[in-house]
Amino acid sequence: MVSFSRAAVGVVADRLAGVEDADSVEVRTLDSIAAEILDEEGVDGWESMSFDARIRRALSELRDGSEPRILDVAHLIVDEVQDIVGERADLVIEALRKLDDDAGFTLLGDPMQAIYDFQLGPKGGTGWKGLMAAATNDLGGRQTQLNGDYRSKDDQIRNAVQARRKLSSVDAVPRQALALAHVLNEFPSAGSVEAFARYVPRWAGSTAVLTWTNGEALSVWDQLWQAGVPARLQRRAEEVVLVPWIASVMSQVQGHFVDRERFLSLAAATEEVPDDAWEKLRRASPGYNDEIDVAALARNLRRGDPPPGLEARGDGVVVSTIHRAKGLEFDNVVLVGPAQQLSPARKPTEQTVREAYVAMTRGMARLVVAEWTRDLRLRKEPRTDRWYVPGYEKWMTRGFEVRGGDTAVPAGDDVEWANSQEYLRTAVSPGDVVELALDPRRSFEVPTYRVLHEGTPVGRTNPDFGAALSARVRMRQASGRAWPELVGARVEALETRTGAGGGAERPYFWLNPRVAGLANLEW
């Protein structure tokens, strides 16, 4: 089974757990299948390729005659097919052509939720309609329409799902936006983020707060933490964040191999290690004689395709853009800012209408509408694709986006490894506020920052972050002023990072704090 995102794959894997004969079902992302093809074909350096480059090269391998084992299946299911466009759609078409003659396939999708065709641009490419046409016209598939609603638990939610009928009855985008706005007006209003934060913890089941942009998501995430509501950010589909217990256990291993008995002994003395931890790591690095090869495990995990159960998801209310919530469902959904987005004054596009419909169909039991009231003039820096908060003058910057991957480096030689790792294990939690303090020893062309948690160094930023910040504030810095300090970001998660090994300061595994938020600049 191929699903759209890693989050969706995790959900499907959880539901299959304990199901009879579930071992015969393999759930993967399309990016994961591409990686499998490249690995099997022995393509050099594929691990360092971007996800798009992997897709492109895997497509080339299939067209050149590759017959990968991953496609030796009895039936291939592709979910969320309306969001598979461009070269990913081409890869699916080639994969379907590689199936055995007696194998079947099922493509599942909802055309009303198609929000990625808009990314194809003027040059075009294969959209989901082209994918479906190839499946039916060239590969003998037949289309079947499913009209039932199998998700909604509440009559009002069912009304939201049935809004598709109103959208189908009108062609003009402004009228579609108006129709959705009328439907959303029937749902309870939660007021501001600060207002609904008071009663969200009382809701049973899973809760998601959906926004239109990542800048808004970062702001809402911070507001929830300020209100005392634990929250987590929904990550990009291609982001792989490993659970922290891997580093907590494996960093204690001395030598190149660890057997089951020694591993279980270390795991028993470590918090939050699941009972099946050994089995999960063995799937990532099979090894021999009931042992795990430490270097091989680190190398396999660096590939970015860990087995189910090794990715960190986090707890609390999920804060997500609508795009990142695709393929997921929640008991409760708060949609922030639809009145503004669907207002005729904003001249909503077809993509905005589709996004609104997607958001309305994520909830199963409750849908609440909230207002976007925070007075932040969020802007996106086109050169870096990052969000920032401008000042009164065009060149001013009050806040700047920090992403989870910006601290994807070891803490460095200014922090004793053992002390920093122990401090992360015992004193740092998601939601904690951190400061980014300039590290003048490493700040030359671009700034490097030490990550301080209550004054204690726990990490540092990488060159990508320094280059992005420099692109935004270079004019200010060129006047002779020092680089700014950044305050107000938070720990998004603790994660396991892996390296090539080679000593105490270059281990195979270490804990790393992922930091995110709209950090305030202090000059």
Where on the chain are the PLM-derived regions?
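P-loop NTPase Walker
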Residues: 1-45
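Conserved two-lobed SF2 helicase motor
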Residues: 26-32, 51-58, 315-323
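Conserved RecA-like ASCE ATPase "motif II neighborhood" in helicase/translocase motors
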Residues: 39-73, 85-95, 320
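Conserved helicase/translocase motor-coupling segment
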Residues: 192-318, 322
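Conserved active-site motif detector
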Residues: 382-523
